[in-house]
């Protein structure tokens, strides 16, 4: 019986599984980065990866957790902007700001945002993916409470082992747009 056994083994030991999940989470974040046309491994569709259904179901909570941490961290970083300075680093004005009480308030207001970045980095171990998450993905989801991703099962199984494939993608970018039918216009007879 499988009572209280959470998660799928996926034919791997725990360290291999943890590395697999971290790599897949960073892969979906990195599909959103700026790419050039000459880059050999540019994603076909940003914000989407194709994997097996079981792997997609396992990494989805991890992706959602990272985005939630990033959204909360962005809110804290925005609160620190009122205490920041525009002076150039190393200048006399900057040194005065650095020694003042305002700097302490800025550092205290900014620290939860930095902690959020460190927590996400501890989960996925990819600095570039963390930057993409905080700079381009999390700002899109600031008004959304959760459910940042969707899993769509693909009809064709994987060649070789007949594994069920699925798409894991971010919600809101490739949504279907339903067109409303236009109401017919009737001419009103003048009497």
Identify what each model region corresponds to.
Residues 1-138, 170-172, 178-191:
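Ribosome large-subunit tunnel/peptidyl-transferase-proximal elements
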Residues 8, 12, 147-148, 161:
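Gly/Ser/Thr-rich helix-start
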Residues 115, 144-146, 163:
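Short connector loops at helix/strand junctions that flank enzyme active sites
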Residues 131-153:
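Conserved short secondary-structure elements within globular domains
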Residues 149-172:
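C-terminal edge-of-domain segments
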Residues 160, 177-178:
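Intrinsically disordered, low-complexity acidic/polar segments
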């Amino acid at each position: 019986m499988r009572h209280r056994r959470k998660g799928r083994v996926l034919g791997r030991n725990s360290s291999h599984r943890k590395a697999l999940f971290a790599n897949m989470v960073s892969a979906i974040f990195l599909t959103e980065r700026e790419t050039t046309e000459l880059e050999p491994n540019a994603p076909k569709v940003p914000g989407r990866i194709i994997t097996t259904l079981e792997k997609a179901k396992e990494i989805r909570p991890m992706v959602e957790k990272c985005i939630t941490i990033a959204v909360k961290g962005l809110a804290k970083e925005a609160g620190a902007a009122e205490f920041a300075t525009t002076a150039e680093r190393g200048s006399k004005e900057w040194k005065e700001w650095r020694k003042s009480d305002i700097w302490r308030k800025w550092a205290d207001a900014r620290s939860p945002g930095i902690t959020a970045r460190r927590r996400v980095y501890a989960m996925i171990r990819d600095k570039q993916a963390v930057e993409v998450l905080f700079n381009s993905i999390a700002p899109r989801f600031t008004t959304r409470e959760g459910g940042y991703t969707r899993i769509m099962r693909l009809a064709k199984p994987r060649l070789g082992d007949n594994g069920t494939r699925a798409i894991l993608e971010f919600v809101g970018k490739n949504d279907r747009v339903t067109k409303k039918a236009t109401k017919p216009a009737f001419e009103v007879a003048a009497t």
